[in-house]
Amino acid sequence: MTDIPHDHPRYESLLAREKVAAGVKMGITSIQGLIAQGRGESFDYLIGERSTESALYAERAAVAALLLAENPVISVNGNVAALAPDKVVTLADITGARIEVNLFHRTDTRVHLIIEQLKASGAAEVLGKNPDASLELSHDRRLVSSKGIYTADVVLVPLEDGDRCEKLVEMGKTVITIDLNPLSRTSKTATISIVDNLTRALGNMAKFAQEMKKERKEELVKLITTYDNKRTLSEAISEIQEHLKTMAAETGY
């Protein structure tokens, strides 16, 4: 990867680009993943490359859902494996969630490489190599594990496709997404939509999970029952508008 100076004002964003590009070279990330990363980065600009209040609100609710779940699962694709495998493993360890590889552009080689990447980051078990169940979808994201996504009650699906998100919700699952675009079908379909950068979101969630594990079950239930996803998305859009107004005022446009 290119050596990026730590004092560069956009160090984290440039590092993310390099990680996804490296993922493509390693065979972990698909070429299409580069496009998805660029699209996400453009929305990150719009929120000021920070975790907004609406994002933090959704992240806390998401952690509560994971901690209360009977069979929580974190779904991992190529971009997630390239960007934050260590953070996935940390969050899974704290919440007791299983990890499952699920890909749109699926090959046995890619699945193997992603599993090895996650295990190198500390994962003891990763599902997805030998899927034995299927969702009602016409592409390879339908292939899932009966121990994982298929029977999960709560699924964290970072950087998700809208159609699979919709199908998982139809199956009665609590679906948590991380998507920087509050207007996407994924964001509008999910149960809990986190409008934040993947790396920031997973880091925040691990921190919250460590703290919230000590809370009473009633407090976690309250977080879930009072959570309003429409409010989250509305506030995320308002935060974009406010950031743009601030930038316009600062530049004199």
From Swiss-Prot:
Keywords: ATP-binding, Coenzyme A biosynthesis, Ligase, Nucleotide-binding
Molecular function per GO: acid-amino acid ligase activity; ATP binding
Keyword hit for Ligase: yes
Residues that hold ATP according to the record: R17, R39, D179, L180, N181, R185, T186, N197, L198
Catalytic activity entry: (R)-4-phosphopantoate + beta-alanine + ATP = (R)-4'-phosphopantothenate + AMP + diphosphate + H(+)
Biological processes per GO annotation: coenzyme A biosynthetic process
EC code(s) of this entry: 6.3.2.36
Misc note: Was originally thought to have pantothenate synthetase (PS) activity. Purified recombinant protein shows no PS activity on its own, but the enzyme enables substantial synthesis of 4'-phosphopantothenate from beta-alanine, pantoate and ATP when coupled with E.coli pantothenate kinase. ADP, but not AMP, was detected as a coproduct of the coupled reaction.
HAMAP family named among the record's database cross-references: PPS (MF_02224)
Record note on quaternary structure: Homodimer.
Sequence similarity: Belongs to the archaeal phosphopantothenate synthetase family.
Listed name of the protein: 4-phosphopantoate--beta-alanine ligase
